[in-house]
Amino acid sequence: MSQSDDRIVRIDLDGASMGPGDVNADHERRVAIADLLEGNRFRPDGEVDGPYALRLAIEHDRLVFDVRLEDDTPVHGFMFALGPLRRIVKDYFLICESYYEAVRDAPLERIEAIDMARRGVHNEGSTLLRERLVGKIDVDFDTARRLFTLICALHRRAAS
């Protein structure tokens, strides 16, 4: 197995977890998926070599990682309580709202300050996600950032 097989080649967000979203969130989701597929490191613990397909969902207030091989052979499923991520996701949503409002008419300095705060909260969520995945799935920081964006998209839609 080569290191290049330690990657996601397909990602699906559960349609049942998805509802109508706003334009900005939908754009962020599409960009996160494209960036994730372009470059990621993703390796479930165990003996099964990739590349992998990943389905993300929210079921019964839990985050579901359904990991499969590229041919849809099941590898492993993981469920995580949303509680530890909930505060960070909520903070991220609030900062994103402020950012989108500021982009319309705020001075550049204010937009930059809000964007720095937004990236900081996003990094915090990504770090927490990596910590939650330890012993289950090995991901690099950029992959965790993109997955956090997708988890936020699911969380936003599950809450609406």
UniProtKB/Swiss-Prot annotation:
Disulfide bonds: none
Record InterPro entries: UCP032146 (IPR008321)
One Pfam family cited in the UniProt record for this chain: UPF0262
Family: Belongs to the UPF0262 family.
Protein name per UniProt: UPF0262 protein Mmar10_1128
Organism: Maricaulis maris (strain MCS10)
Lineage of the organism: Bacteria, Pseudomonadati, Pseudomonadota, Alphaproteobacteria, Maricaulales
